[in-house]
Structure formats: structure tokens, C-alpha cells
A protein has these predicted regions:
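Alpha-helical transmembrane segments of integral membrane proteins
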Residues: 256-477
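Gly/Trp-centered helix-boundary motif
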Residues: 1-278, 285, 430-448, 452-456, ...
């Protein structure tokens, strides 16, 4: 192609080019949004921190599957409040009331209940926290009484508790709630159940259900009001946030793994990681391979011999065993993987570019440049490189999916960078936890499809560039 405009027109003529361009734009936009909106230390601070995901359901499918189900599964919900709805003066003390509303509309029960308390501030005596639930049938259940206890009260400044990590109460396993529900059943329904039997039945069925004659519980749909009452001696005492976790059986857009991690966030973070690995590896490998190939073909002599023998040796070394070996020795850090891929990724391009340069070396425009006294460096840069540049660009794009697939293979083998979530790591953890045998399709299909998507994107671009690089293909079309 003689001009850039002709090359662009030729590239844009094929449908593969258009689809590949659309895919790469989509991949780039998602990667930029992720980098701008998610912390760069997401892997170490959140993804590898099980405490951060403790309130999520474990191994839950995505919530959108309810669209295809007649009997809807309970969606996971966290309902919170940061400000009291009411402050009441009790004469010498105060009562601050927080109200949470939960709309229960399912034929099944929540899988667990958790109450969460954040950033509790008090000045004098520790407050008392009480939590009640008012059901749609106006029956009241006391689910938690928590007298705040702390050692070494601060007399000069306010005491601050649960600032960095919230205080959690797993109500589903609370013995005091078992006793409270035992009393509730006797008082409201004249049913005598021991706390042990309440534990076996499950607190969720009793709180959100109506007892039946056969001993089962029928879900009671409607709005549930959760009242959080803080009794304190100082009006300035406060709670930064209260939250009630209603454990569901479906979660978010992509579900969760066995640690409760939101797979959607992990998959999103994998976009810029895949793009970084692919582009960094392919760009560096292409630069090294192109420079050595041009120098080898034009300079010739011992320089050509040394470069080609080194390229032959490196090109015949099996890459995957070396990747496994070096990542096992030096650790599976991202830049170690990129470095190894670059070191062993340049020879094939060097060999091909050299053969192209050998034919260009005897061309008229090169001989004319030599005749007017142009230096070897200028000839290689100004006359030879532009002739092989389209091919080099096509190879750069074609090498990118190889790097992405290599990193995914290492991660799948458990040798990836543990501090960064990648699609291969998600697949590896899924297989190690039996996701295939347990039917956790949402844990396997999305990362696998995204790996294929990223690889196909660059393959389509490379196929679109073939008519630009190879005039014979252009004429056939």
C-alpha cells in the first residue's frame, strides 16, 4: 500500500477489521474505566482479603438468573443507614433510633442474617445497642442486645470503636437469639420449641415465616422494619453506620466464589491486566525482534551469524516449561512473567524480518542511498524500516494474544501473580474448588470466555491487516 490513507481504506474494507476494531475499543474503554474507578491495590487490599467478603453469600449464582425462574431465589441485600431517624430525650439519657426497611417477596428464606456496626463514638459511659424486627403482621422480635464494653476508656477525647473494621454479629448462629425466638414462638403462636430446636430449624424461617400445623414454616411476605436503638448518656454519642445483611442465594451480575468474592469485580480488574500483559510483552518483543532482524539482515557478516544462531537457539527452547520453572523459582510476579515472555518472544520475528531485509538490501532505493553516502543507520531507519513496518505491526498485534494466553496458562497452573486477580487465576481457583463437578458454571464460563474474547480481538485485527501487508491477498479480493 503506497500511502497511509490507502492502507487505512484497505484495512477498513473487511468485516474482520471492523469487528476487531470495535472489540479493541471496547476492551480499552473498560480497562480505562477500571483503572480510574478501582484502586490499583485491589488485589492485595480487597481480593485477597477474606474478611472484606465475609458478608457475601458463598458460591452464589448471578441475580439475573431469576429472570428465567418461576420460583425466584432470594437476592442478597445489605440495607444500611448512616443517620438516626429519631433522637429522643429520656431525661438524663438519650435514645437514637435507626430504621431499616426490608421488602421480603420470595417463596424461600434468606440464607443468613448479619448485623453490622461501624464507627461507634461515645464520650462517657458505653452505650447499649438493641435491635428489633417488626414483621408485616406487626409482631415484634428482639434479635440483639449489645452492651458495649471497652477497656481503658478515654476521659479526654471521645472513644471510637469499629472505625477500620465493622463489628459483625452473625445472628444466624447467636444462642441468645435462639432463646429469644423460642420465647417469641411461645408468646405469639403458643408453640414450645427449645433453643436447640430453633437452631435446627433456622432463625431465618422463624423470623420470616409463619408456623404451619405440620411443623414447617411458610414465608411471610411484606415489609420488615428493623429498628436499631442506641441508649446513651451523651447526646453527642453516635453510630457512623448500621447495616443489616440479608443473605441471599443469588448475588450481583456474576455471582460469587466459595469465599464470597464478587466475581464481577475480579473479572473487571482482569481487563487492564490482560491488556497490560499482552501489549507490554508484544511491544517489547516486537521492538527487540525488529531491531535485531533489520541489523542482522543489513549488516551481515559475523553480526548476522551471531544474531541468527542466538535466535535459533532461543527459538527452539520450549517456552512453557521454562515459564513454569522461572515463575516457581522467582515467584509468579507480573513483571517476571512479562520479562520471561519478552526474552523468549523475539527470535521468530528476527528470523522473518532478516529474510525480508536481505531482499530489500539489493533494491534500487537502498543502493541509491548508499551511493550518495548515507550511513548504515540512516538507511536502516529511513529506507528499510518503512518497508517492513506493516509486517512488524501485524506481528505485534498477533503476538498479543499469545502473551495473554501464556499468562492465563500460568495462572491456571497456580503460578500467576497472587497479588493481582486475573482471569486465569479465577479459573484456577474454580477448578481447585471443584466448580466443574459442583456445577458452578458462573465461576468457569465468564473468565474462560473473556480469555477467548481478548485473544480473538487481536486475531481479528491481525487478519484485517493481512491484505495491507500482503498485496497478493489484496488483489484476490
Amino acid at each position: 500500500v503506497s500511502t497511509l490513507s490507502e492502507a487505512r481504506s484497505e484495512f477498513w474494507r473487511s468485516y474482520t477489521s471492523k469487528v476487531g476494531t470495535f472489540f479493541i475499543i471496547l476492551l480499552t474503554i473498560i480497562s480505562i474505566v477500571v483503572v480510574l474507578t478501582m484502586p490499583l491495590d485491589f488485589g492485595t487490599r480487597y481480593w485477597s482479603n477474606p474478611i472484606y467478603w465475609v458478608d457475601n453469600p458463598k458460591a452464589s449464582p448471578p441475580a439475573w438468573i431469576n429472570t428465567f425462574m418461576q420460583d425466584k431465589l432470594v437476592e442478597h441485600q445489605i440495607i444500611s443507614s448512616n443517620a438516626p431517624a429519631q433522637v429522643e430525650d429520656l431525661g438524663g439519657s438519650y435514645m437514637k433510633q435507626y430504621i431499616l426497611t426490608y421488602d421480603f417477596k420470595y417463596s424461600q428464606f434468606p440464607s443468613f442474617l448479619t448485623f453490622r456496626l461501624t464507627n461507634l463514638v461515645f464520650y462517657d459511659k458505653p452505650p447499649i445497642i438493641r435491635v428489633y424486627i417488626v414483621r408485616p403482621d406487626n409482631k415484634l422480635i428482639s434479635i440483639l442486645t449489645y452492651p458495649v464494653t471497652v477497656e481503658g476508656l478515654n476521659q479526654t477525647s471521645p472513644n471510637i470503636l469499629f472505625k477500620s473494621e465493622p463489628k459483625r454479629f452473625l445472628l444466624s448462629g447467636d444462642p441468645s437469639l435462639f432463646r429469644a425466638l423460642s420465647d417469641f414462638l411461645y408468646k405469639e403462636f403458643n408453640i414450645t420449641y427449645s433453643p436447640e430446636k430453633v437452631s435446627n430449624i433456622g432463625v431465618e424461617k422463624i423470623i420470616f415465616g409463619i408456623p404451619q400445623q405440620d411443623g414447617s414454616f411458610k414465608p411471610l411476605n411484606g415489609k420488615y422494619q428493623v429498628y436499631v436503638l442506641m441508649y446513651c448518656d451523651n447526646r453527642n454519642d453516635s453510630i457512623g453506620g448500621v447495616a443489616m445483611v440479608f443473605g441471599g442465594k443469588v448475588y450481583g451480575l456474576m455471582g460469587t466464589d466459595t469465599l464470597g468474592r464478587d466475581l464481577f469485580q475480579g473479572l473487571l480488574f482482569g481487563f487492564p491486566v490482560a491488556l497490560l500483559i499482552g501489549l507490554a510483552t508484544s511491544i517489547l518483543s516486537t521492538i527487540i525482534g525488529a531491531i535485531l532482524g533489520i541489523v542482522s539482515g543489513y549488516v551481515g557478516g559475523k553480526t548476522d551469524l551471531i544474531i541468527q544462531r542466538v535466535a535459533d537457539i532461543v527459538n527452539n527452547i520450549p517456552l512453557l516449561p521454562l515459564l513454569i520453572f522461572f515463575t516457581f523459582i522467582f515467584g509468579g510476579h507480573l513483571w517476571v512473567i512479562v520479562f520471561i515472555l519478552v526474552v523468549f518472544g523475539w527470535p521468530s520475528l528476527t528470523i522473518i524480518v532478516r529474510s525480508m531485509v536481505l531482499s530489500l538490501k539489493s533494491s534500487n532505493f537502498v543502493e541509491a542511498a548508499v551511493a550518495v553516502g548515507a550511513s548504515s543507520g540512516r538507511i536502516m531507519l529511513r529506507h528499510i524500516f518503512p518497508q517492513v513496518a506493516p509486517f512488524i505491526l501485524a506481528q505485534l498485534i498477533f503476538y498479543t494474544p499469545q502473551a495473554i494466553l501464556s499468562e492465563s496458562a500460568l495462572s491456571f497452573l497456580g503460578l500467576g501473580d497472587p497479588s493481582i486477580p486475573t482471569w486465569g487465576q479465577i479459573l484456577d481457583y474454580a477448578f481447585r474448588n471443584g466448580a466443574v463437578y459442583l456445577g458452578y458454571w458462573w465461576w468457569i464460563l465468564p473468565p474462560g470466555l473473556l480469555i477467548i474474547f481478548s485473544a480473538i480481538t487481536f486475531v481479528l485485527l491481525a487478519l484485517g491487516l493481512e491484505p495491507v501487508v500482503n498485496p497478493r491477498l489484496r488483489r484476490r479480493r
